[in-house]
Amino acid sequence: MIRKEQLYEQILEQIDLTKETDDEELQELIRTVLDEAADEEYISLSDKIRIGRELFNSFRKLDVLQELLEDDSITEIMVNGIDHIFYEKEGRIFRSKKCFLSQERLLDVIQQIVGESNRYVNEASPIVDARLKDGSRVNVVLNPVALNGPILTIRKFPSEAITMEQLIRIGSVTDEAANFLKKLVAAKYNIFVSGGTGAGKTTFLNALSNYIPKGERLITIEDNAELQIQGVQNLVRLEARGPNAEGEGAVTIRDLIKSALRMRPDRIVVGEVRGEETVDMISSAMLNGHSGSMSTGHANNPTDMLHRLETMMLMGIDLPLQAIQRQVASALDIIIHLGRLRDKTRKVLQIVEVEGYEDGRIQTKVLYEFKEEGMKNGKIQGCLMKKNEITNKEKLLAAGYHTV
């Protein structure tokens, strides 16, 4: 039986390392090696095509991961060492039959991905976040932290940003709620999108950002560039950078927020806040005349999101908790909470208004809430129901919206 690793080694031996081999030359070399192998042992045409494609991917692309990346129905790829490759499809986890030829080949693919993002990873610095050219999010963990071999996780993003109309069509949000949010964005309400891992926060923030008036100057700030803002001409995209091998040259989210404030922004969108940069997002951006700012955060519910914001602000500034709570209550207008339900669908579960600070705590009001109504054909039935009218209408009225 023809072994792919033997063919790989034969091709590697015949490549002229003194000059660059283009794609056409490589494909011709692969065909020649396959034809020679077919003279010794029968290879069907379909197998020839498959093996040829796999060999080309090994040299030019991301090896055995390439086919998974090209499958639009796959949303996540998980590599646990060379021969344990899993992927998520339609909410379910499957194991791939593919495997890397060696740990060295897997490490080559990892270094290729990380290098294209201007990051680095090695045993001295074994954890890194990066991204693919299409914006897909990548996380890498190496030995000695990863005990069973290199760990590579890729969360894929659609080639084109999902719109709010598409989210309405698949039932993630209702038309009524989306129209309400459209008015809030246009009226420059400060909005946080919360939810657990994989709830669709970045996707929803992308869709929400399409409601930003196209004539505004928008600055996006991210750890890894994932946002796909559409239609805004005056757009500035900033991406944080980790330290170099000498531990120098890091540019943090906090640094970028401070810099963005000097760029005359109409709005600032931060992909996700995780730590002390929350101080600058809340105190400097949202409370400093840049209404309409948006961000996301990990939380189990809107109340949890508020507590996490308080905790993250305490990490970055020495103020009493009461003062922190007052700042959060003054800065934040709306929390949109997303969830991934047991049928694997993603939905808006709550839209909550932050009313202010009173009686020693931040006061909130549920405006919309998802109400489950049972199961049908394995899918959860329900609707995002309006519960209350918004209290703080000043920004809506100033924007010309007299009915909501």
Language model region names:
Residues 1-123:
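N-terminal accessory targeting/assembly segments
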Residues 188-191, 207-330, 337-339:
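Switch/coupling sub-region of P-loop NTPases
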Residues 195:
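The Walker A (P-loop) glycine that initiates the GxxxxGKT/S ATP-binding motif of P-loop NTPases
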Residues 71, 84-187:
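P-loop NTP-binding catalytic core
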Residues 11, 77, 140, 181, ...:
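Residue-level signature of catalytic and energy-coupling elements of molecular machines
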Residues 201:
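Conserved lysine of the Walker
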Residues 343-404:
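NTP-binding/hydrolysis catalytic cores, primarily Walker-type P-loop NTPases
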Residues 198:
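Walker A (P-loop) phosphate-binding loop of P-loop NTPases
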